Amino acid sequence: MLEEIVVEGRQRSAAEQVLQERIELPVVADVVSAEQISRVGDSTVSLALRRLPAVTVVDGQYIYIRGLGERYSSTTLNGAQVPSPDLTRNVIPLDLFPAAIVETLKVQKGYSPDKPAAFGGGNVDVRTRSLPDRFVADIEVGTGWNSDSTGNGYTYPGGSDDRWGTDDGTRALPREITGAIDQYAGDITPTGILRALDRAGGFNTLADAEQVNRDIALNLNRNLDLRKQSLDPDINVEAALGNMWQVGEGGDWRVGGLAVVDYGDQWRNRERINRSATSPDVDFDVTERTIRQTTLTGSVAVGLDWAEEHQLQASWLYLRNTEDEASLTVGNNFNFQANTGSQLRNYRIRFEERELDVLQLSGRHKLGGATLDVLDFVPGVRNLEDLVFDWYYTDASADTDIPNEVQFSAVDRLDPDTGEFLSTSIRSSATAADYRFTELQDDVTSYGMKFEMPFETGDFLIVPSGGYDYYEKGRGYLQTQLGLGTTASAALPNLVGTPGQVFTDENITNASNGYVLSLGGIGTESYLAGETIDAAFGNVDVTWKETWRLSAGARWEDFARVSVPIDQYEYDTGVGIIRVPLEDIQNQAFAEDDFYPAAALTWMPGQLWADQFQLRFGWSETTARADLREISDATFIDPLTEARVRGNPNLVSSDLTNLDLRGEWFFGSGDNLTVSLFYKDITNPIETVEAPGSDDNIGLTFINAASADVYGLEVEWLKGLDFMSLGKWSDAFFVSGNVTISDSNLTIGSNALNLTNNERRLTQHAPWVINLQLGFDAPNERHSASLAYNAFDERVFFAGSNGAPDAYEQPFHSLDVVYSYYPIEQMALKLRAQNLLDEQIEIEQGGVTVLEQSVGIVFKFDVSYKF
């Protein structure tokens, strides 16, 4: 067996504590511990994962592994699949998980049959804190601030529960409006109301219907004027309490429990500049945004253990992550220019509450010595010695609520000669005020089991294993869009002012102003979807003389999915009934079943330039499937990008062939070196491409490209600086890091849709990624520090079409420092500074910076105490 690597030092040991698991795994994987995450000061899972080799983060939420996006990866929580609160993707955004709940993060880059077959870049398993083996009571309190957010920021009148990240009903769609939509059969325009009034009998005029329409509009929340206020510093509180008790005289029974709570509240100013690639001096805008992010996490786990052979555990996890945004955008286009005395002005508010609620039950049972003594009366039971049986059950739901997302469109009047601001007016438009109310509910039930039965024969250790997984998911997405405005010339004098000054009761109810409230959208924004996976797998792991190890097996999956657009305000069959024709379901359904094989070979010669050496080779065949909305033959407006997106029911799954070669050197001092080569061949990769849009929205759709491949080199290391012979101080320092150099090639083929480049790199693939860290552990264990650097090369942000070049996100160089002081063993003071280089996000297209967004320098201070 491989020897255990043991070293000392607060920070350096954190990296080495997870090495043993990585050594013993049959496939290529990387593991990061909670201590490592704490060392570099990352607050979420997504930020922590970017420190691993060949891992990058997009939009602060989505993980790209080896150049492949979230479509080609899967995320599990304690080994089980969970739902996603993401509005337009099937994958769970990893910024939802705070680092406070994490025990370890495992990124498996080599496929094994016990993992979902939807595997390309890798599988991320978020493993929550395990039950303690002794009494623990921890508390941590922190504060912080951002260099861009130390002054004033935008806000608006919200609800009384905003500090907890939930709305108290202030933003909810008023019952009076939903009642009116039902009463008038989904058409609340004056003509629709008039038809309903006529059906009810009596003499009614269009003027009567217009008045009813205006009365309905009065129920909208219009007290939304932006205002500036001083921003509070960051607040974060984290606490944990747990214990393990021995029960009974023999002490074989143990009962344990752990509870963790985490609360965070922060304000951030984000300035963003958008420019047209073709006319950046004419078509551009500047957005000042203030975002309040509130997080609330609670988890409880209880467990029972008998003789260290049988474990039962029940855990509950609740996550809430809310972003409350207020923004003001001012800009120009070809129709509104400062030299002609006008510019555009848009006010926007958006409150997005995301929740994840997970209940997990699991068990592990081993026929060890204590169990066999109890079952000795069963004939032949000892022939099953060391049989292990694992099982799990997960019931989870994810919800996203975006109430009262509002945008007011306005026009500023300027002095053409000086550019001096003169006045602002709400635009003369039927949708000058755009209201959206969005709800998403994702429900997942999954369960499974696995067994393994190790036995030895001669020089061979053989471990056959197998199991079953079931996954069922249902999703409902409902969006209501309302437009309020006027195009009446008589109303023009009353459009001058802010939204709160213009959309008053007096102005709306004045018939001469001609205000009209209408249902917006195109009828297919809402949808219902579901999918199921039945899976069975088997594997054999054979080790010969502790020198050669072969692990080979296969997974069978029966996959089915359907996604159907619905019009929740179609009243052909009555109020409250959503009609979905059987033909639509059949046309939108997709099903497939297949086998996915995998094999991994490891050579373990012992010492080869190191105390321990391993050489791994892996091969597998996997798949990547379209997201729920991508297969729906409907057009919808993406709530995040405002793009007009059309699904493609003709999409087929992508087939992947994966090859890995990795050499690992482990030294007795704890130093280690890893060198990996990887190659992936993808048939029918799914890509997002530009499609015909509208004057107000770009168009996007999805196609199967012809082929793609990804290949690269990863190098990872940990090295102490004791070789410098500078006494105890050189022993206190270490360097660690990783570098990934890779490339990819995507061939679109005949589905190019006028794309400028039929061949290019995969979207969001960075040719190089680098992580460097200099660590310090004081000999007296009172001080520790880390200087961490993360950077990536430019990556394709979106593909250009009709001759326009591709757009590239520019390199981002992140430099962070963390210092910890331990005045006593139980107490720690931690100071963190992030993005010390004050980098900003930039996207270039054809030499023009089409997007700039500030990030700011972050400073944080935490105090923790362990009782």
Could you say what each language-model-derived stretch is?
Residues 96-140, 866:
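A beta-strand signature from Gram-negative outer-membrane beta-barrel systems
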Residues 440, 447-450, 492-495, 499-503, ...:
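Outer membrane beta-barrel strand-and-loop segments of large Gram-negative receptors
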